[in-house]
Amino acid sequence: MSEPRTLLVIAGEFPPLKTIGRIRTVKFVDQLRQHGWRSIVITLKPSGTEPNYDPSLMAEIVDGVEVVRVPIRNREDEIANAVKRLLGRKPAAPSVSAATVSGAAVAVAAPVATAPSGGLMDHAHAMTRWVLRSFVDVPDDFRLWADEALKVARKLCAERRIDAVYTTLPPFSSMFVGHALRRETGLPWIADYRDLWYGDVL
């Protein structure tokens, strides 16, 4: 009997986060298993405090699926805390807000958005957020997570037999992982567009 082939899955939405996007990936890797493929899933590492965190959803992951969880970084928090340290202030703990992915809320660590009150710091914060979201965190807020996920994926490709790469979008930053692996390894890359890249899906 031949050895099962291995699919490396890059999925921002996966149990135990309760999102619509998780269902497709869970069912997909289950169906592949029945056709002789095993899957390694690289996904977000939840903190357990997210409003859509549901540990009971772990039961959806079928036996034999290997899950590697990568923490999500928040660029706004990192910049804000760096400035506070320079000013001698105590860095704030990240708050939890929801980033919209494929019509569902994916809870991530993020600063609470508030309207500038007119102070210098408020205006600086608002400007920083605008610059990041307009020119840096493109195509979405998961760009830093994708960079970390790529490091993990490269290590897996170097140490394990990987036969193909599958990225499911959104978050659209997952695409960068698939594109880089395709370029560096020559592995087949499947990009699953669940939603529009741009515009309101509704």
Residue ranges and their predicted role:
Residues 135-150, 165-185, 191-194, 199:
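An aromatic- and histidine-rich active-site surface loop
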Residues 44-147, 156:
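A conserved catalytic-core segment of Leloir-type glycosyltransferases
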